[in-house]
Amino acid sequence: MQVPRVKLLMGSGAMFVFAIIYGWVIFPKILKFMISKQVTLKPGSDVRELWSNTPFPLHFYIYVFNVTNPDEVSEGAKPRLQEVGPFVFDEWKDKYDLEDDVVEDTVSFTMRNTFIFNPKESLPLTGEEEIILPHPIMLPGGISVQREKAAMMELVSKGLSIVFPDAKAFLKAKFMDLFFRGINVDCSSEEFSAKALCTVFYTGEIKQAKQVNQTHFLFSFMGQANHSDSGRFTVCRGVKNNKKLGKVVKFADEPEQDIWPDGECNTFVGTDSTVFAPGLKKEDGLWAFTPDLCRSLGAYYQHKSSYHGMPSMRYTLDLGDIRADEKLHCFCEDPEDLDTCPPKGTMNLAACVGGPLMASMPHFYLGDPKLVADVDGLNPNEKDHAVYIDFELMSGTPFQAAKRLQFNLDMEPVEGIEPMKNLPKLILPMFWVEEGVQLNKTYTNLVKYTLFLGLKINSVLRWSLITFSLVGLMFSAYLFYHKSDSLDINSILKDNNKVDDVASTKEPLPSANPKQSSTVHPVQLPNTLIPGTNPATNPATHHKMEHRERY
């Protein structure tokens, strides 16, 4: 039985082409299409529910820099810092007052963060530890007045001495008081300078202060931010254009900010950091608007990574070098004067928060080496202080992330305020925070079995088809080669039979040398019948036929 070589060749070739086109072109497009239809912020969708009410808390860590030599620093000495932490909190995020705009394909919402102290994870710390930090009201207030309203320095100095009697440049207080419960601000004095100073509390300019009665306030770094509005966003839902999913369109009902000198720095780039569009390319980066910095930040691809056995991409970010990067000059106080730009690895938050604060990576990681040298007690390293995100591009899922940021006081001596007149000029770290998330198996399995299982099946199928098709192509090539290099055995047998038939009809030839033959051969008569005779009964004829057959 012969194998149909042509059919085998055509079938194997078709299988090979199908495996290539389906496995690398058609299936990925089908998968991306299915994901794009599922991953939207359309009301009623699973993604919308997870996005609006995160069903699990994020981990929020606070590390505080305790100043161990406050009196010496007040006289100009180099600060010695002791890192205390982490104080661990469960951070719950939810969005409320949602309003959809079907025509614009957007949804507006108010973001709310709630911090709940986790005593078990914080051990051995309890939150009642006493910390020494720069006075959070007196130092920023005095420095701001000196820079912006020097003519009011005498009035402010007198008011501070009344509101904070016997105050020093550094304040010793419990951690929970400094960050959540609040330190007391007494505005009960009727003295003009004190009343003038307290005006900023009554008008709400000091956002970290909470009024408890007509004459007293409580100031804390994060107390007012706990379980309260952190801004109103308007973002794209991604129904009409999935590539715009989560893109910030407005913040505080404004299409752009009015904070920085240049319009480019005031634009919103990226999402609200709680959702990302699927199908991103690794070189696109992960951009998000951060209200705490009044700025959009972009994480860039670093290397491949994995999470619970699933492949992902590792992204990282830093604050860059504003002075060296022309695109970032709009974050300088004066874009035309580079001397007003902050040092490498830092960002001036004065325009954003209204005080002499600087943002940086923890321990000034990736910052100007001078920043680290100006104080004792810092040890910047990638493992503990870098920002990272392990991200799955096709589904737009962040598997794990750690967003880290340090807040520093841009400190300088203040001549008009006695406790501050000898302070050194430097950027003093106060505390840094980490907002982290690690998806558990409940949520990673959703990605694993809806995305990676399909990809695995497709991979097995396409490579199996390619293997079978290559085997078929090689076997058909072998058959074609065998056909051209050898003769078919049946054809050989048929040719031999034809030769035998032809040979049986031919007469023997006379010997070329009569001397070598002792037999006399009779003369062959023509094969015709003589009239009146029958060769079957003619003895002579019969004798001749028998004689010929013997030869």
Swiss-Prot record:
GO terms for cellular component: cilium; dendrite; membrane; neuronal cell body; plasma membrane. Disulfide bonds join C265-C330, C294-C352, C332-C341. The chain crosses the membrane at residues 8-28, 460-480. Residues 1-7, 481-551 are cytoplasmic. The keyword Membrane applies. Its main location: membrane. It comes from the Eukaryota. Residues 513-540 have a biased composition (Polar residues). Plays an olfactory role that is not restricted to pheromone sensitivity. Has a role in detection and signal transduction of the fatty-acid-derived male pheromone 11-cis vaccenyl acetate (cVA). Not required for sensitivity to general odorants. Acts in concert with Or67d and lush to capture cVA molecules on the surface of Or67d expressing olfactory dendrites and facilitate their transfer to the odorant-receptor Orco complex. Essential for the electrophysiological responses of these olfactory sensory neurons (OSNs) to cVA. Not required for the development of trichoid OSNs and support cells. Belongs to the CD36 family. This is Sensory neuron membrane protein 1. The gene is Snmp1.
